[in-house]
Design a protein with these regions (language model features):
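Short helix-terminating capping/connector loops at secondary-structure junctions
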Residues: 31-35, 132-139, 291-297
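Alpha-helical membrane-targeting segments
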Residues: 79-111, 115, 245, 252-264, ...
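C-terminal helical/tail subdomains of lipid-metabolizing enzymes
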Residues: 107, 115, 120, 280-377
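Active-site periphery "cap/insert" segments of enzyme catalytic domains
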Residues: 107-145, 154-156
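Active-site gating loop/helix substructures
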Residues: 134-223, 227-228, 233-259, 338-347
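C-terminal amphipathic alpha-helical segment
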Residues: 252-291
Length: 377
């Protein structure tokens, strides 16, 4: 059975995924090279996906190197944090309104993420992807981005010859040789980071318009899925006591981010569980009669944070660069004013990331029995 790894988006929250992967590596035998023949990443999840697939060596070594990156990560490694750079981009955004909203010379955005491009282009060995596919270590690696021209969710994948492109409602799979452009396109949060041009189209963050985040792995042949999310309330609807004031801009943006990066995954998981129940209940004779013999249950193991990421983010807002703290405070993203959810997507700070990695590690080890069952150990 082909095992697929699905890594969702979530900005700095994706540090949690690294902790889970580290925990899985500790549970698996040291000799395991790559336990996931099919790997899919979206947004910040694409960073982790390509960092695992685009490096040689045992899985434990790959996760250890990835952890080192996140442990030492600072905002300056991801986007320009100097006041001049932030003000310059803000001016470009405002100036674009004079030109009917178009960016002149380059795509408009509040932040310049060229440091991330440089870092990931140096770290991910894109040439190794072909080697891994050729030697059978990898069946497919995919990252998803949103097309600004069509509004489609486009999954760019590199895989073996048995995997055919697909075209469904508002989503398609395109076989291609992956590059740093595809990674940067998948992580380009609209408004925050610049759109990326690929061929004649511009692309943005893959979590936007990705209504079926689990489907790319299934299209590429996975029949067992391990999904690492970044929602801290999966399956729970906590009761709140209301608000004393109207929501701040940051709180509104936070809910919009959560809608893009979190809600679609939870909804797709719920749909998959319902399909699994239906597939398990249908006898073989009825499947053959209705020509749905390929409807089989998909084994799924989903791991998500057991603690509130928003609460952890609230403790680390003061670590952000001064220029960004000033900007966020104007939108209400403060420890007192709320909006820490929106800020958590930009909190590429060692203290915050390390806490998420530690939580991911604990959550994975707490599911050791489930993980061993998933890998048939």
């Amino acid at each position: 059975m082909s095992k697929g790894l699905v890594l969702t988006g979530g900005g700095a929250r994706a540090a949690y995924q690294v902790g889970v992967l580290k925990g899985i590596a500790r549970i698996l035998p040291r000799s395991v090279y790559n336990p996931f023949p099919i790997i899919c990443g979206t947004s910040a999840g694409a960073i982790n996906a390509l960092s695992i697939a685009g490096r040689a060596g045992p899985f434990r070594l790959r996760t250890s190197k990835l952890e080192r990156i996140w442990n030492e990560l600072t905002p300056a490694d991801v986007y320009r944090t100097d006041p001049r750079g932030v003000l310059k981009n803000t001016f470009h955004v405002l100036a674009s309104f004079v030109h009917s909203g178009y960016g002149i010379g380059k795509p408009i955005s509040l932040l310049d993420n060229s440091p991330l491009r440089k870092m990931m282009d140096n770290y991910v060995k894109f040439d190794y992807l072909d080697t891994a596919i050729s030697n059978g270590e990898l069946e497919a690696i995919a990252v998803t981005a949103m097309s600004y021209a069509s509004g489609q969710s486009v999954t760019f994948y590199q895989g073996n010859e048995t995997i055919a492109p697909w075209n469904r409602s508002r989503r398609r799979g395109e076989k291609i040789e992956l590059s740093i452009d595809h990674l940067m396109a998948s992580t380009a949060i609209p408004g925050l980071f610049p759109a990326v041009q690929i061929d004649r189209d511009y692309f943005g963050d893959g979590a936007v318009r990705q209504l079926k985040p689990i489907s790319p792995a299934l299209h590429m042949g996975a029949n067992k899925l391990l999904i690492i999310g970044v929602s801290d309330n999966a399956g729970r609807s906590p009761r709140v006591n209301g608000m004393e004031h109207s929501p701040s801009t940051a709180q509104i943006v936070g809910h919009m981010f959560n809608s893009a990066f979190i809600d679609a995954v939870e909804s797709d998981l719920e749909t998959l569980h319902n399909i699994n129940r239906l597939a398990s209940a249908l006898p073989q004779s009825l499947r053959e009669k209705n020509n749905i013999t390929d409807l089989n249950p998909i084994d799924v193991l989903a791991i998500s944070p057991t603690e509130s990421i928003d609460s952890i983010a609230q403790e680390h807002l003061h670590e952000l660069p001064r220029s960004l703290r000033l900007f966020l405070s104007l939108t209400g993203a403060t420890a007192q004013g709320g909006g820490s959810s929106a800020a958590s997507y930009l909190l590429f700070e060692p203290g915050f990331c390390r806490k998420l990695i530690d939580m991911g590690m604990r959550d994975a080890l707490a599911k050791e029995a489930d993980i061993k069952e998933f890998f048939e150990l």
